[in-house]
Amino acid sequence: MQQSSELFFASSNNHKFEEAQRILSNLGLEINMFKTTLEEIQSNSMNEIAKRKALDAFRKIKKPVIIEDDGLFIESLDGFPGPYSSYVYDTIGNKGIMRLLENIETRNAKFVAIIAYCNGDDDVQLFESSIPGKISLSIEEGGWGYDPIFIPDGESKTYANVSDKDKFSHRSASLKKFSDWFMHTQLDSGL
């Protein structure tokens, strides 16, 4: 098992860290939080945003680090807010998203998550997953971020109210891809 002092999760978001820690721990990988505010470039490319954040995090901590970036892509809004999800949430929130979707029947959406790993060189590894779903008709209680309005396919409740979000969330799927790669890489390098 990877020692917790050797791998860090960089974020200013405690919710993201707690979710990542819980998921990775269940996969046999321990992480520590590196609480920091990372450079958040504005780009149409989530990959570019994730790479820049991972490089920024490594420059600050000088240790192997992962970051997570995600976006909510709403079909009827041409993928908006997409890579601008964090900014949009901070400015208009879930109420603003619901106003944009007033009188719109097609509420299909997907959540995309990217885990980016950097260990010092400029070769950032990316692990992406997406979960299809739809936007609810109302804002549910609980959860954080867009959880109260996103209903994953096959569910009748939003992320905020499903019993085990970790089993099928976009973040969980990306973290699993990262964990599989990281554990395999560690075994290959003899660490």
Language-model regions: role of each:
Residues 2-8, 15-191:
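Anionic-ligand binding patches
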